[in-house]
């Protein structure tokens, strides 16, 4: 009897994002084994127990907590551990706090799962993904950040609300940093095959284009608005992470705006940024050299320089 290959996923961090991601993965039936690791072992144990007791309602999955040794031979290791921005802080304000945490996490993950794909979710995600790449010694394809997959979903949702259509029929991308310097790629935005400006003219008698100024700011501020009200974000980001995991494990060749290592694309080098990228079983297979506008390219380069500056001033070395 030939047994189907099992998929083992480990999640480092049992906070709001980590535990909700475990729930989303469990619901989606992507993994046969999920291991949750956290410095607070009681918290990790409780989250795993709570999830495991719903096993009768989902596809067969073994959910448990443990230490790094229990993550051995994981296919994907998702890193959600770290401190999040407090009200009034930006993602970039917490670099060195999370860098210290990552210096303790990444070597342990690499030790036990040297062939895994590392999926970084903790913020600032682009910088921490670059740091993970440097600390792990893994090939660039196997170190992936969640990038702007969530931001892109937020924009699709907002455009769908604006035009009163299904979000799945909106095609657009947020590129660059997952943060304040991110760029809305309006040049790549289309609905029903029509550029968003042309589509707007066909459905709106008074299309002044103001949404192109308003919605990007709403996307940038969405997380801060949620954090100010409930203290954290967890649901949408967990769904975004699950979508990335799905693309990897199912070898989809899906195009997602994950954070990938730039090596000369658009004149940018040696920094992780979000860009439409082919995601398959190898991880982030290829950044697509899509035709963005000159203004978008200039802003992408500025975004890269901002991140490089923060990396240079970090305590990486």
UniProtKB/Swiss-Prot annotation:
Q: What positions does the entry give for substrate binding?
A: 91, 123-126, 151-154, 233
Q: What is its EC number?
A: 1.1.1.27
GO CC annotations? cytoplasm
MF terms in GO: L-lactate dehydrogenase activity
Summarize what activates or inhibits it. Allosterically activated by fructose 1,6-bisphosphate (FBP).
The organism's superkingdom is given as: Bacteria
Q: Which reaction does it catalyse?
A: (S)-lactate + NAD(+) = pyruvate + NADH + H(+)
Query: What SUPFAM superfamilies does the entry give?
Result: LDH C-terminal domain-like, NAD(P)-binding Rossmann-fold domains
- Tell me, what is an example of a GO biological process annotation in this record? lactate metabolic process
Asked if Transport is a keyword of the record, the answer is no
Query: What pathway, per the record?
Result: Fermentation; pyruvate fermentation to lactate; (S)-lactate from pyruvate: step 1/1
Identify the InterPro entries for this entry.
L-lactate/malate_DH, L-lactate_DH, L-lactate_DH_AS, Lactate/malate_DH_C, Lactate/malate_DH_N, Lactate_DH/Glyco_Ohase_4_C, NAD(P)-bd_dom_sf
Subunit and interaction comment:
Homotetramer.
This protein's name: L-lactate dehydrogenase
Per the UniProt entry, what species is this protein from, by scientific name?
Answer: Clostridium perfringens (strain SM101 / Type A)
């Amino acid at each position: 009897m030939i047994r189907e290959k099992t998929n083992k996923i480990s999640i480092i961090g049992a906070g709001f994002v980590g535990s909700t991601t475990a729930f989303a993965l469990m619901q989606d039936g992507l993994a046969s084994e999920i291991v949750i690791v956290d410095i607070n072992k009681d918290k990790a144990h409780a989250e795993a127990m709570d999830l495991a007791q719903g096993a009768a309602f989902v596809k067969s999955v073994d959910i448990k907590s443990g230490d790094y040794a229990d993550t051995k031979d994981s296919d994907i290791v998702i890193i959600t551990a770290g401190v999040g921005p407090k009200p009034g802080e930006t993602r970039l304000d917490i670099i060195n706090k999370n860098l210290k945490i990552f210096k303790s996490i990444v070597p342990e993950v690499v030790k036990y799962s040297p062939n895994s794909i590392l999926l970084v979710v903790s913020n600032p995600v682009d910088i921490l993904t670059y740091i993970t790449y440097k600390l792990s010694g893994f090939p660039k394809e196997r170190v992936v950040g969640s990038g702007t997959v969530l931001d892109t979903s937020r924009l699709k949702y907002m455009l769908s609300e604006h035009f009163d259509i299904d979000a799945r029929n909106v095609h657009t991308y947020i590129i660059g940093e997952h943060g304040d310097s991110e760029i809305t790629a309006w040049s790549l935005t289309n609905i029903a095959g029509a550029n968003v400006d042309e589509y707007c003219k066909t459905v709106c008698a008074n299309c002044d284009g103001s949404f192109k100024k308003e919605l990007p700011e709403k996307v940038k501020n969405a997380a801060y608005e949620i954090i100010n009200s409930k203290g954290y974000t967890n649901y949408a980001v967990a769904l975004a992470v699950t979508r990335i995991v799905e693309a990897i494990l199912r070898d989809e060749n899906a195009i997602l705006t994950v954070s990938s290592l730039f090596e000369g694309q658009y004149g940018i080098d040696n920094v992780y940024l979000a860009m439409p990228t082919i995601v398959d079983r190898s991880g982030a297979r290829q950044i697509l050299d899509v035709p963005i506008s000159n203004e978008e390219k200039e802003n992408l380069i500025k975004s890269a320089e901002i991140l490089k500056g923060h990396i240079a001033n970090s305590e990486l070395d």
